Amino acid sequence: VNAQDGKTAHNRRDRIATTGRTGPISTPEQGLDMAELDNALYERIGALSDAGDALMEDGDYAGALEKFWAGFDLLPEPKTNWEAGTWLMAAIGDANFYQEDYAAGRDNLGEAMHFPNAIGNPFLHLRLGQCQFELGNLDRAADELMRAYMGGGPELFEDEDGKYLRFLATRAEGIETP
């Protein structure tokens, strides 16, 4: 849910954008880097991302990954210059997390941190921290989950398994747990 307007985020880009300070999403109307992409290319990437989002909603994570990677492959080089790369890598890492492929999630979300507006984005830090936790990398998990908590507050964790927030409370004082 977008804390600013109370609306539910309907796709991965919205979720990432509503949980980030500056969010890795941009639209042609905002005049950010996606506006610099050729309109046809922007539409193709957006359509693939939307298709991936729909597959995620249906629980078809492998199918979603195919769509997200296809969109990512369309980005011009260097891919790390594009905010679209941020939200595509975030969506890929999110799908990895839901597939319980935590090593791939860690790797892809770690790679996402090299893209614009990724560092400091609470959603990215949340998913990266969750992957680190599941892999047993507890110090790294605590660091990433704290970044997520500091940027997104306890509400960022509302729809997540309570074990992540309970774990964070063992590592830091003042963590609000349900």
Predicted feature locations:
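Flexible helix-coil transition and linker loops at the boundaries of alpha-helical arrays
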Residues: 35-38, 75-82, 113-116, 155
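Amphipathic alpha-helical segments of tetratricopeptide repeats
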Residues: 72-75, 110-114, 149-150
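TPR/TPR-like (Sel1-like) alpha-helical repeat modules
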Residues: 133-156
